């Protein structure tokens, strides 16, 4: 059962960012192996960790198209949902891109300073496919790259046994964890392949884990090196992204998912419980939290969690999360709840409150969150799937200093300078640069400025 505590009982450690250790040495070894041995290393780790280790890694575009057509035929509702999600995400990303204006301004006579926004040339996307192949993650990671104007998008996702190889795999007793089918055709989860095609991916590789991150960072014979890598993954993928940062850009090092709900007594306990469980089912260490100033409401939500939980197919995972990481905080006021939320800096923050001045006040107080969901009808799962927002968000307190994945990740803001010979501004800048070069003891700097006078 979820723990109910008073705000005064919260321990300092609860506000600390959560870290998961024990991966660095293993992942560093994988990265070094991929750098030295390329595709050979990828095959080795595929045989060690995956259900399939294909002969080649690149999935033909025709296979992606076939997966999309198959999804449209047999699951039209899911196909349409992916298309709708992609459409909204693309519109939102374009709106974000439009907010980054290019300009040139004459700050002083004859000195023109400017700003240009340029897309990166190559972007790598990692899409996990463990217990729950995350079709929506394809939309959230690929779409902003497309909107940014990235020329080449490389998507890596764990391999699956190709349909044409399944008979051979079954006969050999392979194609299962611990006994991979080797040498077959490259293939992946069909939903991920379909979503990749819908979103415009042309290069999809059947390669997963930290080895895929290393391959995208450094390049192999088959998988090209990229400029940035985005997308979620397990602790090994997260560690690999952290280690390759610097060689490439990364979106963030994300941990287990979180939701923090500030609820008043007008909220429906069933709705709040449903939102908490939607996070809890992700992972046994997911962190579902609610804060309220109404103790009776807190107990109603707790009871509703128990009613709904037993009906879930994901009950085992959700139960572990609720019992070990879940929390309902009874506060002295909703303002205090907002202050606690700011200190926690959650991935998702919901204001399950009736419309009015109090909700407006709380909305003005909260400032540390990945995404904010305002009011009873703005369900967090809408942001997960189909509202235009990106669901790749900062966790473990990182919302204190950064936002989520956006089109910005795939854009570089660079600056320019143009100077008119003999202008007043050029003379003043040259003189100032000369004096500052002298002050810092950098004679060549001073000379490079004064030589133009």
Describe each PLM feature range:
Residues 174, 197-287:
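Conserved NAD(P)+-binding/catalytic subdomain of aldehyde/semialdehyde dehydrogenases
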Residues 1-121:
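N-terminal Rossmann-like NAD(P)+-binding subdomain of aldehyde/semialdehyde dehydrogenases
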Residues 105-190:
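Conserved small-residue-rich beta-alpha loop and adjacent elements
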Residues 151-160, 288-295, 375:
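Short internal beta-strands
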Residues 343-453:
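C-terminal core of ALDH-fold dehydrogenases
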Residues 282, 290-369:
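A glycine- and small/hydrophobic-rich beta-loop-beta segment
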Residues 3-8, 203-208, 328-333:
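Short acidic-hydrophobic, aromatic-tinged amphipathic segments that line or gate anion-handling sites
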């Amino acid at each position: 059962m979820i723990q109910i505590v008073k705000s005064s009982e919260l321990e300092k450690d609860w506000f600390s960012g959560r870290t998961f250790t024990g991966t660095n040495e293993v992942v560093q070894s994988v990265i070094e192996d991929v750098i030295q041995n390329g595709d050979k290393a990828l095959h080795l780790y595929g045989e060690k960790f995956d259900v399939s280790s294909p002969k080649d890694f690149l999935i033909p575009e025709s296979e992606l198209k076939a997966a999309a057509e198959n999804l449209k035929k047999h699951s039209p509702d899911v196909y349409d949902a992916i298309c709708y999600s992609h459409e909204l995400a693309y519109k939102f990303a374009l709106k974000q891109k439009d907010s980054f204006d290019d300009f040139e301004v004459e700050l002083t006579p004859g000195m023109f300073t400017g700003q240009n926004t340029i897309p990166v040339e190559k972007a790598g996307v990692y899409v996990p496919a463990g217990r729950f192949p995350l079709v929506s993650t394809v939309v959230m990671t690929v779409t902003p790259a497309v909107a940014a104007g990235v020329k080449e998008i490389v998507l890596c996702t764990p391999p699956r046994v190709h349909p044409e190889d399944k008979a051979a795999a079954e006969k050999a007793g392979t194609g299962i964890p611990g006994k991979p089918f080797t040498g077959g055709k490259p293939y992946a989860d069909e939903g991920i392949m379909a979503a990749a095609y819908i979103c415009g991916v042309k290069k999809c590789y059947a390669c997963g884990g930290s080895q895929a991150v290393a391959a995208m960072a450094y390049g192999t014979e088959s998988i090209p090196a990229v400029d940035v890598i985005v997308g979620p993954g397990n602790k090994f993928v997260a560690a690999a992204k952290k280690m390759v940062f610097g060689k490439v850009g990364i979106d963030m090092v994300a941990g287990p998912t979180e939701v923090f709900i500030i609820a008043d007594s007008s909220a429906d306990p069933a709705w709040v419980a449903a939102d908490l469980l939607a996070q809890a089912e992700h992972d046994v260490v997911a962190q579902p939290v609610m804060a309220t100033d109404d103790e009776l409401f807190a107990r109603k939500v707790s009871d509703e969690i128990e009613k709904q939980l037993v009906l879930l197919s994901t009950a085992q995972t959700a139960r572990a999360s609720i019992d070990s990481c879940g929390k309902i905080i009874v506060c002295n006021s909703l303002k205090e709840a907002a202050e606690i939320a700011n200190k926690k800096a959650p991935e998702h923050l919901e204001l399950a409150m009736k419309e009015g001045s109090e909700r407006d006040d709380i909305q003005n107080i909260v400032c540390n969150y990945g995404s904010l969901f305002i009011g009873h009808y703005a369900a967090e799962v809408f942001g997960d799937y189909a509202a235009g927002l990106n669901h790749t968000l900062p966790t473990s307190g990182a919302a204190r200093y950064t936002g989520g994945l956006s089109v910005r990740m795939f854009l570089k803001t660079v600056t320019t300078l143009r100077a008119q010979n003999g202008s007043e501004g050029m003379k003043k800048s040259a003189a100032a640069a000369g004096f500052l070069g002298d002050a810092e003891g950098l004679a060549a700097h001073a000379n490079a400025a004064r030589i133009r006078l």
